[in-house]
Amino acid sequence: TSSAKALGIEKMSERCVQGRAVMVDLHAHLGRERVRVDYDLLMNILHKDQVEVEPGDMVCLHTGFAQMLLEMNKHPDPHAVENSCAVLEGRDERLLQWITDSGLVALIADNYAVEGLPASPRPGSCAALPLHEHCLFKLGVHLGEIWHLTPLANWLRDNGRHRFLLTAPPLRLPGAIGSPATPIATV
């Protein structure tokens, strides 16, 4: 734990995390290729799928990464793990500005860090995880990582939907700054 007092994760567990969520199915467009998704590519996918992100939404990014790990059946291939599935381009200023302007309250993915790890090099920027810095420290936007989104993404796509009710309470860990979540999607 970090001994966080006023902003410990237990504050969220007292009231839960619940609200409207929207699925962005990057995997349906990009497959398992390692692609750094910038603002233009994300907007193109949102437009093609007619997905609208509104203020207060929890945005789920389905990349297929967690499903790929499960398919490795406890024998992960390090090369595949390092070089597969979409990640957000954390150094894209337009993408970071869209996150701010959209009013989203959580950004969730089925990969390790939501953004590319390590981040793309950029002169003048020392943040190892610039999207984390932007979301967590500047905006207070929560990040969810390594969620198994494939069954939900498939159901939503098969039923022509993108929105659902997401309930994702963190564990009650006094003083901690993060926690595993126990998410439930209601469709």
Model-derived regions: residue spans:
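Active-/binding-site microenvironments in catalytic and ligand-binding cores
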Residues: 1-187
